Curated annotation (Swiss-Prot):
Matches recorded under InterPro entries: CASC1_C, IC97/Casc1_N, IC97/Dnai7-like
Known role: Via its association with the multisubunit axonemal dynein complex, may be potentially involved in the regulation of cilia function.
Family indicated by similarity: Belongs to the DNAI7 family.
Protein name as annotated: Dynein axonemal intermediate chain 7
GO molecular function: beta-tubulin binding; microtubule binding
Gene that this sequence comes from: dnai7
GO cellular component, one term: axoneme
The entry's keywords: Cell projection, Cytoplasm
Upper lineage: Eukaryota, Metazoa, Chordata, Craniata, Vertebrata
Subcellular location: Cell projection, Cilium; Cytoplasm
Amino acid sequence: MPPKDGKSAKKKGGISKAEKERLQREEEEKRQREAEEARLIAEREENERLERERIEQEKQHILELKDRERREDELNELRHILDENHFAVTVWEAECREKSKWERYMLCDGSPDPSVQPEINTYISLWRDDSENQIQKVLEECALTLELEKELEFLLGDGPEPSIAEQYQETLLSLQNLIHYKLNQATEELLKFANYNSDIDTGNMQTVVKDSNITLCLWANLNKNPRFKGYKFEEVGLGFELPKPLAVIEVAVRILHTRYDHLSHHSEREQLQKRRSMMEAILTQNTESSAAVHNGKMEGERDESESSKQVDECHSVRSESRKRSAVSVISAKEGRKSSSIKLLEEGESQMEEITTTLEADQHDPYPSPAEPVTDTDVHIVDLQQFTPLGGVFYFDLFHMPPQSRTVKGWEMRELLDTGLQVFPYPTEQSRIQSSTSVKLDEHSNTTVASLPVGVTVALPHSVLFLEDPQVARWDPIGQHWRTDCISETSYDAELRTISFQMTAFYAFTLLQETYANMPFQSWELRPLGQDSALFTITGALIEVSITVKGKQCMLHTEETKDLDRLLGKWMSPSELQKAMRKAGINIFVNEYSDKYVSINLKDPLIEHAVYEQMALMSSAVAFSWSRWNAQCRQEHLVLQACEQLEVGPVAEKAWSLYLLGAQRNQHLKMKEQEDSFSPELAEGSEFHSTFLHMLRQDLSTEGQARVRQSHHLYIDTVQRLLCATRVLTYS
């Protein structure tokens, strides 16, 4: 085949310029078409998004209008329900008080009525002058006196008039002092006859006398053996160790364990007085500053006075209706456009102002804590941070009273009117040497003050220590529990005993952190039937469950050891709280708690309103903790809820999330397990002004019937537990 010419070869070897331009044009046109298509798609998607948003906004607007239209009716209905329940509970409480007074009046057991001043004064005088000092008789009388104290504490809990309350407090203090006085007399009586009751093996006298309230361990040093180191009262798990100088002196050692605590309230009163002094100083400074502002005609005077007036008005409203619900305060004058409704409509600033005012009221169901006084002495125990448990151990050293001697068939005893005398310890070595025939090392400069005394204590069986207990001694001068002068502390968890040394003989107690079981890890309130529910809190250390049935509560916990007196017993909410705190199982908070526990700060008005409505629905609706609650700001709460009519655990898929606020409550589309939070409404759901109506719209007929038939005392009991634990803030 003949070869092609050069032109053909050139064409074959490359693309012509015209061809390149054509291809480029085609490529450019393709890019433009694709870009146009992408633009059109993006524009269409954007239009669709805007349309969806418009539709959503329209739906949102319609729902908001609908919510606004029925807002007044919903708030009024809720207020009416709460007021009815509150009135019924108030009437029942008044009837109970009257019934209790009548039963006390008709009681003919010979015991005085502690509320009647002449009766109780006569009782105190007669017992003080009674010469019967036998220990068993004294313990019996102490038991009666302790019952009278409980009556007085109950009366004080009713909030009597200030003058009456002061009278009750004085009577209470007199009874407490009288008990200790008579126990000292009984101790002296036992020591007078120590030589008759001496132990053959040791040559000393040791005895244990106890009842349900008091354990008295007494040891008298009759043998004065210099090799004596200490003694343990095995039957009660109490023991002591003495330094050698005391082993050769005629002294007596007493360990008096009272299962009640008559000392801590003195420290609480002292701390309260300091707080009041501090507040008075602050108020004085504020007054002086206000006066300076007034005299100087400073700008903003009118605004400040109006703000002060606003706060005073809010405080007045709260004081007059502190037992009513927060929602009642908000909605009581809805139709007259009151400041309570403006609180909901004018945003965060006013809510914070009201909250600040409410925090100052320490008698609220769960006010935010006031600033606790910080003492410069680090050894003083803060009784808000620590709780004395197991009662008080009085560890005392006494002079031995004169013992009887037999002379020519006659028993002779020196009678002294000094009573039981405390042996001063520590004291100078020379003083001890002068009172004994045993000489110590003359070259030693050691004083008895450097020789500590040892104590061993078995932990009380009625108390659950969640952590290793701490020890504090009582300072009678400063009226405080202190942690100094205590050393060599050793705790045996297996034997449940604690040993330590003190520089002197002090009353002491065992301490536990008040909020050791906080913050809560989770919680759940689940119905068990009509007017019955199970409230479970998983704390930082243990899980606690409380069964509610009517107006009664019963505690359950995994830790059952040594809590037989508490577990499985029905009692009122207030009795349960007191018993649980006394047993070391504290899940309750007060006005100082947030100073010691990491919390999710929430608006107290909103929080309290939610607790009220949860209590109303608790016969038919289960509630639970949500991790999203911590992610929301303080004006919003998030929790899980669902209808639960059967007894048993709630199915995981049954739970729904709810976002709650001061003005609006909504059912969320998202579930607890999702990775991110979304406020999108659940399909078919609407906004509601109250949580009650939000839940009620989805309830079955049976569920709604249960809610309507809920007894006011049951509702009050559940509400008290929720307000006392504040699970929405402390978990």
